[in-house]
């Protein structure tokens, strides 16, 4: 991408159907967006998660925050849930998922299934159809996770949201010993 004077701004996706016309992947003009580039982005995101959070169940890829705009991938133990909200990144989704499985496997984490929850209305504004379903072989979509000593069953197929509301981590820690009446 270049500005009106031809000054290089970086590389990204342009979608004139979207309210967010441009989504930047890199601000460097010499960047080559290929599988190695995607793997490095995924690896950097995973290394950050390993350094900052409990990785048994977590948000592995958080869109723009990880310089992969328009895609969110949550990990629930050995299951991935993906939400793709931008046309450009949707086309890279198979590569992103392959690289993520590779990076996780290097840490001994084998993914048994991937479920896509790309059913948000915003996909229609991007010129994409809404989609919800398995990527690859079907599996039991009710996944048991343990967060801060509290066990949950997360329904990745029919749960309210594709994520687990990671914001409530501190609430769980604060109230995990309280009785509910």
Model-derived segments and their meaning:
Residues 1-77:
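Non-catalytic accessory regions of SAM-dependent methyltransferases
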Residues 63-74, 93-164:
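Non-catalytic substrate-recognition/targeting regions of SAM-dependent transferases
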Residues 13, 85, 156-157:
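Short clusters of small/polar residues that mark proteolytic maturation junctions
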Residues 166-180:
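Conserved alpha-helix/loop element of class I SAM-dependent methyltransferases that forms part
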């Amino acid at each position: 991408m270049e500005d009106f004077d031809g000054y290089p701004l970086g590389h990204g996706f342009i979608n004139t159907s979207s309210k967010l016309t441009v989504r930047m992947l890199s601000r460097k003009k010499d960047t080559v967006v290929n599988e190695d580039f995607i793997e490095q982005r995924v690896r950097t995101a995973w290394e950050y998660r390993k350094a900052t959070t409990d990785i048994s169940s977590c948000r592995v890829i958080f869109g723009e925050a990880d310089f992969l705009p328009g895609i969110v991938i949550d990990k629930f133990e050995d299951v991935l849930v993906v939400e793709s909200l931008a046309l450009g990144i949707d086309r890279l989704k198979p590569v992103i998922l392959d690289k993520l499985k590779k990076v996780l496997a290097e840490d001994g984490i084998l993914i048994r299934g991937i479920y896509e929850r790309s059913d948000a209305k915003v996909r229609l504004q991007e010129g994409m159809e809404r989609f919800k379903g398995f990527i690859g072989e079907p599996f039991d979509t009710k996944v048991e996770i343990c967060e801060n000593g509290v066990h949950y069953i997360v329904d990745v197929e029919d749960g309210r949201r594709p994520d687990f509301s990671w914001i409530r981590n501190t609430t769980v820690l604060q109230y995990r010993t309280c009785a509910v009446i």
